[in-house]
């Protein structure tokens, strides 16, 4: 099986063309491939499939390193767009794809950055999903001896965003796994720790469900900005600084889609016998 290794700001992927290759990935195989000592090693596996709808270009599937399938990965979406162009699967600059939960348009810019229409953030608890009596801008959550205030949003996948004074000292490794699998998130969640520098700049670390802390999380950056704007902390255009680099997020508020712009890097092509 041929594959490519790619990354978006250090969030790394194994990308596989299932348009011209017949492939099947069991959870066990994915875990074996994800092993950084005995396999290829990656945060997520991205699979390019033929479109289910003739109006679209491709179907986009995402699997975490633990073998679970998820509906959204923003950094992966940028790599997906570069991959299909690099491999000659399309020469379009605006690429329409379906995901497990919806549709996206991926736009490759002249300088090879990728701008992704992530759709409109959804704050309705049942759509996240998140167990709450009603929608609020902030929720109180308790996990073991910890009590935190957070915002909750879906970017096609569930996110919990906590504002912190300093991301460098945030309790990512302690609170991350506790909140990721909290009973109020029936499908688990990605946990973002956001430091607001000013209305145009945030620093962010994300503990991703099924992957742990990663160098960057595109949908997590989108979620953090959406929550920050909802809470009146941020403007419509925000630079998000993650451990792996920066993303630019634009959201004009309710009724509008959110856009993420950032790089996608091809590292190498490989072949593996399954």
UniProtKB/Swiss-Prot annotation:
Cross-referenced Pfam families: DAP_epimerase
Keywords annotated in UniProt: Amino-acid biosynthesis, Cytoplasm, Isomerase, Lysine biosynthesis
Domain of life: Bacteria
Active site location: 73 (proton donor), 217 (proton acceptor)
GO biological process: lysine biosynthetic process via diaminopimelate
Record-listed E.C. numbers: 5.1.1.7
InterPro entries, alphabetized: DAP_epimerase_AS (IPR018510), DAP_epimerase_DapF (IPR001653)
Annotated site residues (Could be important to modulate the pK values of the two catalytic cysteine residues) in this chain: 159, 208
Binding locations of substrate: 11, 44, 64, 74-75, 157, 190, 208-209, 218-219
SUPFAM superfamilies named among the record's database cross-references: Diaminopimelate epimerase-like
Catalyzed reaction equations: (2S,6S)-2,6-diaminopimelate = meso-2,6-diaminopimelate
Family as reported in the entry's similarity comment: Belongs to the diaminopimelate epimerase family.
Quaternary data: Homodimer.
Protein name, entry field: Diaminopimelate epimerase
Organism (species): Pectobacterium carotovorum subsp. carotovorum (strain PC1)
Gene name as annotated: dapF
């Amino acid at each position: 099986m041929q594959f490519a290794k790619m990354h978006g700001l250090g969030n790394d992927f194994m990308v596989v063309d299932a348009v011209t290759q017949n492939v099947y990935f069991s959870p066990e195989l994915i875990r074996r491939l994800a092993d950084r000592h005995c396999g290829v090693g990656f945060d997520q596996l991205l699979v390019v499939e033929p479109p289910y709808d003739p109006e679209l270009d491709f179907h986009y599937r995402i699997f975490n390193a633990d073998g679970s399938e998820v509906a959204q990965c923003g950094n992966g979406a940028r790599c997906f767009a570069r991959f299909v162009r690099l491999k000659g699967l399309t020469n379009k600059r605006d690429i329409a794809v379906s995901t497990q939960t919806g549709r996206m348009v991926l736009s490759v810019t002249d300088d090879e950055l990728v701008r992704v229409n992530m759709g409109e953030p959804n704050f309705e608890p049942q759509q996240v999903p998140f167990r709450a009596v009603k929608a609020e801008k902030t929720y109180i959550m308790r996990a073991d001896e910890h009590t935190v205030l957070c915002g909750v949003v879906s970017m096609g996948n569930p996110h919990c965003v906590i504002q912190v004074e300093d991301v460098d000292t945030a309790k990512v490794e302690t609170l991350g796994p506790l909140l990721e699998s909290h009973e109020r998130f029936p499908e688990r969640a990605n946990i973002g720790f956001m430091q607001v520098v000013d209305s145009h700049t945030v620093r962010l670390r994300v503990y991703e469900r099924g992957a742990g802390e990663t160098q960057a999380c595109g949908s997590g950056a989108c979620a953090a900005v959406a929550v920050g704007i909802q809470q009146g902390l941020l403007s419509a255009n925000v630079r998000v600084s993650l451990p792996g680099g920066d993303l630019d997020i634009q959201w004009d508020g309710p009724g509008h889609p959110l856009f993420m712009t950032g790089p996608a890097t091809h590292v190498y092509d490989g072949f593996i016998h399954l």
